[in-house]
């Protein structure tokens, strides 16, 4: 009978566990606890004289047993916390059973019954050993003011500053070799840069790019730029020369034009004077005055020189 009930309970739990194949440890723990309760219910049914049981009945009894045990634990925890304790004791469980209407005096006789079935412990499967994580340094223990149930400190390298730097080299020979190699590298880099950006000469006529040499350039006099006029000064000098030339040509053209007009006017005046001799006296007085301002000779402005203080 026990085998039949156990088979029914195991079959139900096996179907349940088979339908929920989970790799989560919490889910596996709940499935194992449920299966253990089903085995206990099957053994109780066998002690009561049942030879077989339906799956729904076994599940209902399992749920009732689980709820009963959960209520005992919850009530014991509440009584424990009311007395300012964190862990329940036997007295808390006894008070809980009494409050739930259970006769505590019948427990010793029930534990010593003759038809008691011994449930063997389930086989323990060796869990795969997880490799330990790589640790750097030694873990720091808790100080006296931190309770032991607090989590441990993480690895020291996660929160302790560990600067990594090389010690400076102080050997004289090593420093000289390092300085020489750096100077040689800088010279090579500068030579390559000058060969790529400037004019070069080659030792071989056939292959120009094999051994490029920097073309020699004559040295310029450093103070020559200060002696030579700048572009702005040259431009100003050119503008001044061009303006003087324009003024000179304008003056020459104006003088030529005036002379031509004077000659024409003299011819006209002579012809008029020959016809009217009375106008000759008044015309001679007006010859020295020019009414047209554009025909007057150019007068340069007077340059005012500053008196030097002696």
From Swiss-Prot:
Alphabetized SUPFAM superfamilies for the sequence: Histone-fold (SSF47113)
Motif placement: Nuclear localization signal: 294-307
Residues bearing the modification N-acetylalanine: 2
Keywords in alphabetical order: Acetylation, Cytoplasm, Developmental protein, Differentiation, Intellectual disability, Nucleus, Phosphoprotein, Transcription, Transcription regulation
Location in or out of the cell: Nucleus; Cytoplasm
GO CC list: nucleoplasm; nucleus; perinuclear region of cytoplasm; transcription factor TFIID complex
One MF annotation (Gene Ontology) recorded for this entry: RNA polymerase II general transcription initiation factor activity
Modified residues annotated as Phosphothreonine in this record: 130
Every Histone-fold domain range: 35-102
Spans annotated as Disordered: 1-30, 262-310
Signal peptide start-end: none
Entry-annotated residues carrying Phosphoserine: 271
Compositional bias annotation for Basic residues: 297-310
Origin superkingdom: Eukaryota
Induction trigger: Induced with triglyceride accumulation.
InterPro entries noted in UniProt: BTP (IPR006565), Histone-fold (IPR009072), TAF8 (IPR037818), TFIID_su8_C (IPR019473)
Assembly with partners or alone: Component of the TFIID basal transcription factor complex, composed of TATA-box-binding protein TBP, and a number of TBP-associated factors (TAFs), including TAF1, TAF2, TAF3, TAF4, TAF5, TAF6, TAF7, TAF8, TAF9, TAF10, TAF11, TAF12 and TAF13. Interacts with TBP, TAF1, TAF6, TAF10, TAF11 and TAF13. Component also of a small TAF complex (SMAT) containing TAF8, TAF10 and SUPT7L. Forms a heterodimer with TAF10. Interaction with TAF10 is mediated mainly via its histone fold domain while interaction with SUPT7L is via its C-terminal region.
UniProt note: domains: Ectopic expression of the histone fold domain acts as a dominant-negative mutant resulting in differentiation inhibition.
Function: The TFIID basal transcription factor complex plays a major role in the initiation of RNA polymerase II (Pol II)-dependent transcription. TFIID recognizes and binds promoters with or without a TATA box via its subunit TBP, a TATA-box-binding protein, and promotes assembly of the pre-initiation complex (PIC). The TFIID complex consists of TBP and TBP-associated factors (TAFs), including TAF1, TAF2, TAF3, TAF4, TAF5, TAF6, TAF7, TAF8, TAF9, TAF10, TAF11, TAF12 and TAF13. The TFIID complex structure can be divided into 3 modules TFIID-A, TFIID-B, and TFIID-C.
Family classification: Belongs to the TAF8 family.
Disease: Neurodevelopmental disorder with severe motor impairment, absent language, cerebral hypomyelination, and brain atrophy: An autosomal recessive disorder with onset soon after birth or in early infancy. Affected individuals do not show developmental progress, are unable to sit or walk, do not acquire speech, have poor visual fixation, and show poor overall growth associated with feeding problems. Additional variable features include seizures, spasticity, and joint contractures. Brain imaging shows hypomyelination, thin corpus callosum, and cerebral and cerebellar atrophy.
Name of protein: Transcription initiation factor TFIID subunit 8
Lineage: Eukaryota, Metazoa, Chordata, Craniata, Vertebrata
């Amino acid at each position: 009978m026990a085998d039949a009930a156990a088979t029914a309970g195991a079959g139900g739990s096996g179907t349940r566990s088979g339908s929920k194949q989970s790799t989560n440890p919490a889910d596996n723990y709940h499935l194992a606890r449920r299966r253990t309760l089903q085995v206990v219910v099957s053994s109780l049914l066998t002690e009561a004289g049942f030879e077989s049981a339906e799956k729904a009945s076994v599940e209902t009894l399992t749920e009732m047993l689980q709820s009963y045990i959960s209520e005992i634990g919850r009530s014991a925890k509440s009584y424990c916390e009311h007395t300012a304790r964190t862990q329940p004791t036997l007295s808390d469980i006894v008070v809980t059973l009494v409050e739930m209407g259970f006769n505590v005096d019948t427990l010793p006789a029930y534990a010593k019954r003759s038809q008691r079935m011994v449930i063997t412990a389930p086989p323990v499967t060796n869990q795969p050993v997880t490799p330990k994580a790589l640790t750097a340094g030694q873990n720091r223990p808790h100080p006296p003011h931190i309770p032991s149930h607090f989590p441990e400190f993480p690895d020291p390298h996660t929160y302790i500053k560990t600067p990594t730097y090389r010690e400076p080299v102080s050997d004289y020979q090593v420093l000289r070799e390092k300085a020489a190699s750096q100077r040689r590298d800088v010279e090579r880099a500068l030579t390559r840069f000058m060969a790529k950006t400037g004019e070069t000469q080659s030792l071989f006529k056939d292959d120009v790019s094999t051994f490029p040499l920097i073309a020699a350039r004559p040295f310029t006099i450093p103070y020559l730029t200060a002696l030579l006029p700048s572009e702005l000064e040259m431009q100003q000098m050119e503008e001044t020369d061009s303006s003087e030339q324009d003024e000179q040509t304008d003056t020459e053209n104006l003088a030529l034009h005036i002379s031509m007009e004077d000659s024409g006017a003299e011819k006209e005046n002579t012809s008029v004077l020959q016809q009217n001799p009375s106008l000759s006296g008044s015309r001679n007085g007006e010859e020295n005055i020019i009414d047209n301002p554009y025909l007057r000779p150019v007068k340069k402005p007077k340059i005012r020189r500053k008196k030097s203080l002696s």
